[in-house]
Amino acid sequence: KEGKYPAWLRVPGAGVRPYAGDTYTAPGKVITLEVGIHGIPVTMQQSVYDALAGGALSNYWTFGRDSRDASYYNRVVVGALRAVDFICSLPQYNGKALGVTGSSQGGALSVITAALDSRVTFLAAVHPALCDHEAFFKKRACGWPHYFYYYGAPDEKQLETVRYYDTANFARLLNVP
């Protein structure tokens, strides 16, 4: 439909699954872009995602955990920022109101995206994950994926990597509601 519209980026929680797109929040009133993070089509049969989750993408959050540049989340964060670029390139986008939302892993990606891109004007982060991983050392609960509970005490490279992608470090950079 002709006109200029606000936009909404939806980033996913953890897992490997299909996405149908958000056609229900504000149909005809907002541009919505819902993205996956794994670089695979989001419209395949559930059995394909189940096989990937149990195989090639099993524990994807640990991939490259010895280097912030090789970390799985490096590509994921860049992808979220590129999604903002794409929205901003649309002639239908009003150039004023751009939100990002997600829960758990998506909540973390919402915070990170809003902290890194000033074009994001609002966010809705629902129980963001990837937070305060070092709470493990203080015998406190930490955020998903609980790296050190399941994988043991980290070496210095792993610790540096999880610190780099810790949502708490991005939250302090937020300038949007």
Descriptions of predicted regions:
Residues R82-A141:
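Primarily recognizes the serine-hydrolase "nucleophile elbow" in alpha/beta-hydrolase
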Residues G3-A14:
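Short beta-strand element of the alpha/beta-hydrolase
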Residues P27-G28, R119, L174:
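Short, structured coil segments at secondary-structure junctions
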Residues K138-P177:
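The feature captures the conserved acid-bearing segment of alpha/beta-hydrolase catalytic domains
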Residues V16-R17, I40, C131:
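Active-site loop signature of alpha/beta-hydrolase-fold enzymes
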